């Protein structure tokens, strides 16, 4: 068994590099405690959901470097990274995480803007005359 488990999680344009070591349950994201980084309870619970489901919140110290995107994409990226790290540490948690779809990379990305349109799908205002 490796001492440090490192995995990558992605969501939209966010990339999270997760480093998991056996410890006391500290979660550090970009050198800040998770409570400071994700001030919103919804984003924080989304990011830490794999730990809560597998009931391993106090077993590991997790250090995360996350960059790109917004706060929602980053919380999704952290969640995927933690889920992958837990699976790498212990294969028995895989079915639990898989049923909750926490091991699946969300493929949805922002659709590009097309020419002749205001946004990706929105058209310019139509003028009859």
UniProtKB/Swiss-Prot annotation:
GO CC, one annotated term: cytoplasm
Origin: domain of life: Bacteria
Keyword Protein biosynthesis attached: no
GO molecular function, one term: structural constituent of ribosome
Parts of the chain that traverse the membrane: none
Gene Ontology biological process terms from the UniProt entry: translation
Keyword annotations of the record: Ribonucleoprotein, Ribosomal protein
Ribosomal protein listed as a keyword: yes
Family to which the UniProt record says this protein belongs: Belongs to the universal ribosomal protein uS9 family.
Protein name: Small ribosomal subunit protein uS9
Lineage: Bacteria, Pseudomonadati, Chlorobiota, Chlorobiia, Chlorobiales
């Amino acid at each position: 068994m490796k001492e440090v488990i490192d995995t990558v999680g992605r969501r939209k344009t966010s990339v999270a590099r997760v480093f998991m070591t056996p410890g006391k349950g500290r979660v550090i994201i970009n050198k800040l405690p998770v409570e400071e980084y994700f001030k919103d309870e919804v984003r924080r619970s989304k990011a830490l959901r794999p730990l809560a489901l597998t009931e391993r919140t106090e077993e590991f110290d997790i250090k995360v470097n996350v960059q790109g995107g917004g706060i929602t994409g980053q919380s999704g990226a952290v969640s995927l990274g933690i889920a992958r790290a837990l699976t790498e540490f212990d294969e028995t948690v895989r079915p639990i995480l898989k049923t909750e779809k926490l091991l699946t990379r969300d493929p949805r990305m922002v659709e590009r803007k097309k020419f002749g349109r205001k946004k990706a799908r929105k058209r310019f205002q139509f003028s009859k005359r």
